[in-house]
């Protein structure tokens, strides 16, 4: 049997990009889809984005680090000692205010790892490492030994992960295939010319009776001005940063001086403290 599987990840709230990817999936005639995590924030999408995901109806959902941060932030559980953590808390507050409570409850149940058997091909699916969905252990330029960690079981043929926002095909030391679909809503690349290409990214893997017969890295154009208009209409926090991302691909998640200025200017730190005081629970985050 022939399977044409759309694999997508790291939407980061970008409704307009995901809608374009979904339309491309339909045009390409995919038979199923797998989602590898990081659905919300910092983009425009909230309940509308969740509703779009229900239309796509992935057979696999994986929980990413930003999914965990949205869940924890919505519960007031991100300690606020750094500007970046205020940023995450304030984004999570915004998502929590706009989605049905069952959305975050459902996300909390998403697994960190799934193993699928497609015909004779055995595939491990994660957001990052099998037991850790954050960090830079699998950045694309790192040694092969790092990627061997994706192959927990000896009988695996293929590992697919996400998180680093780069389309990737490479091999383990045993020449098993490692794939990454890139990012729907927030593509990254240190090479300036490649970073200027801000199309939505995803992957189609075709598997037939003989094995893996196709690996298609897709790039889909969409309207960045339309996404910015949606963000403005949704009154998202940190919209200046989202505008920069839409225009240049730059993100400022770890730009502490800039985040501190915005947190002070718009009262985000005060709002986050008030929100967390209502929940009265503080935990260390991984951000």
PLM segments and residue spans:
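Short aromatic-enriched loop/helix-cap "lid" or pocket-rim segments at secondary-structure transitions
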Residues: 72-77, 137, 191-192, 228-230
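Active-site neighborhood of phospho(di)ester-bond hydrolases with catalytic His/Asp-centered motifs
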Residues: 7-9, 33-38, 42, 60-65, ...
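N-terminal active-site segment of His-dependent metallophosphoesterases
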Residues: 1-52, 56
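Active-site environment of divalent metal-dependent phosphoester hydrolases
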Residues: 12-17, 41-44, 66-71, 160-172, ...
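Acidic, His/Gly-enriched loop-helix segments that form or flank divalent-metal centers
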Residues: 97-218
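Acidic, His/Gly-rich catalytic cores of divalent-metal-dependent hydrolytic chemistry
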Residues: 173-287
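Active-site neighborhood of divalent metal-dependent phosphoester bond hydrolases
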Residues: 56-114, 141-150
């Amino acid at each position: 049997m022939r399977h044409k599987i759309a694999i997508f990840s790291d939407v980061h709230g970008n409704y307009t990009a995901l809608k374009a990817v979904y339309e491309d999936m339909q045009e390409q005639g995919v038979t199923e889809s797998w989602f590898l995590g990081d659905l919300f924030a910092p983009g425009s999408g909230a309940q509308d984005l969740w509703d779009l995901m229900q239309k796509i109806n992935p057979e696999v959902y994986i929980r990413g680090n930003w999914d965990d941060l949205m869940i924890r932030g919505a519960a007031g559980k991100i300690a606020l000692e750094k500007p970046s953590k205020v940023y995450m808390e304030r984004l999570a507050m915004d998502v929590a205010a706009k989605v049905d409570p069952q959305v975050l409850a459902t996300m909390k149940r998403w697994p960190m790892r799934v193993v699928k058997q497609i015909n004779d091909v055995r595939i491990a699916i994660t957001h990052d490492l099998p037991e850790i969905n954050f960090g830079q252990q699998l950045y694309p330029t790192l040694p092969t030994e790092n990627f061997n960690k994706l192959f927990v079981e000896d009988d695996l043929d293929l590992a697919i992960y996400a998180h680093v926002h780069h389309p990737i095909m490479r091999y383990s030391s045993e020449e098993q295939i490692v794939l990454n679909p890139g990012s729907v809503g927030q593509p990254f690349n240190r090479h300036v010319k490649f970073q200027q290409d801000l199309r939505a990214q995803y992957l189609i893997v075709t598997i037939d009776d003989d094995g893996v017969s196709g690996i298609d890295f897709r790039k889909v154009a969409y309207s960045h001005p339309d996404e910015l208009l949606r963000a403005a209409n949704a009154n998202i926090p940190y919209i200046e940063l989202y505008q920069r991302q839409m225009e240049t691909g730059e993100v400022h998640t770890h730009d502490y001086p800039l985040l501190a200025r915005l947190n002070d200017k718009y009262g985000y730190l005060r709002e986050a403290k008030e929100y967390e005081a209502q929940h009265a629970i503080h935990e260390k985050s991984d951000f």
